[in-house]
Amino acid sequence: MSETKITRRAFAQVSAGAAALALAGGAAFALADAEGSEEGEADEAEPAEDDATAEEGVVDAKGREVAVPESIERIAVTCMGGGTQTVCTFGGADRLVVSPSMAKSAPLLLKIFPQIEDAVDAGTFDDVNIETIAAAEPDFCFVSSTSDKGNAAIEELGIPTYTLSTANATVESMRNDYINTSILLGTPELGEAYTAFWDEIMGAVADAAKTVPEDGRLVVYRCGAEITAANHTPWAGTWIEAVGGVSAAENGTTGDVSVEQVAEWNPDVILTSGDIEALLADDRIQDIAAIKNGAVYAAPKGTMGWDAPSPEVPLGFAWLGAQLYPEAFSGIDVEAECVAFYKNFYGYDLTDEELDDIFKRA
């Protein structure tokens, strides 16, 4: 199993009172006491960050009050793989009838929730096939905050929608999305257990980040496969800064930048979605601090990557904190938390090999 830099006890304490909730395959499993990545192009919408629930419904990422149906039996998702992962996490796998193809290309997600394979692909965001959606006869659809045009077309079919934060996510809006999804899907106990997990991990992350001295904060650059492919989305800034890092580029900086610009930023750490060894060997950037020190990392990938909004993202915060500040974050055992999360929320026992695969890119 791969060695991580986090070696002490974990913080998550998931309540056993949320036991026997139906998840994958319609089977119930007990939530035992446990100890222990799709960013689209963001638009200007501001995700709702106030109370997750309204008097007669829930409030989505667009600030709309969405009525809670008596039941939801046929679910459509049109916001990449993370939306499907969210639905599965909160008990909706058996009810999926429409899901983007990206979810089917996530091996571990598909292994845990094989029901995804039977859902039809109707596209994503604004590029959706309305005829395919209509033919699947969903009675509810989870959509993205970045796709007003596609969402409106779905609503014209008379299908109620809930807008997930996706690329516009903040820490608070994501937490609200997951609470609300559990309410909509009729699994509020699972939502309560999840928020207990979230609050413990994110609280531990915040506490650890506070111990990082101002003059010891590391500058972090996030890129694609090439060093010149900047990928400092707003979410990347949230991720980096929440653990005590400093974003090298202004949040929202994406696309081509020059090697000279990266050299001027001179990041202490580089996060990449590409090949780590290729970046370390790039002759153009050998004088950059991160390259000199071998501080180039790629986020772990579970059912989805840990560097993008998804239910596994608290694990991503803890992991990144440990890469930047191993001593400050030594109190969170990320591997143990990952195993507990999969058991408690997916009803799935990770093998040692699967756990190693999740962390192997890091």
Predicted segments, located by residue:
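Alpha-helical, coiled-coil/dimerization segments enriched in small aliphatic residues
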Residues: N231-T254
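Structural recognition of the beta-strand scaffold that forms the well-ordered cores
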Residues: A76-T78, V97-P100, F140-S144, Y162-L164, ...
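Extracytoplasmic substrate-binding proteins
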Residues: A54-V58, E65, G150-E226, A249-E250, ...
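Short helix-initiation/N-cap motifs at beta->coil->alpha
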Residues: A61-G63, A119-E131, G252-E260
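C-terminal segment of N-terminal export signals and the immediately downstream linker at the start
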Residues: A27-G57
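Proline-aspartate-enriched helix->loop->beta-strand connector
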Residues: I130-V143, V259-G274
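N-terminal secretory signal peptides and thylakoid transit peptides that target proteins
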Residues: S2-A19
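A short, structured surface patch at a secondary-structure boundary
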Residues: V77-A136, F140-F142, T146
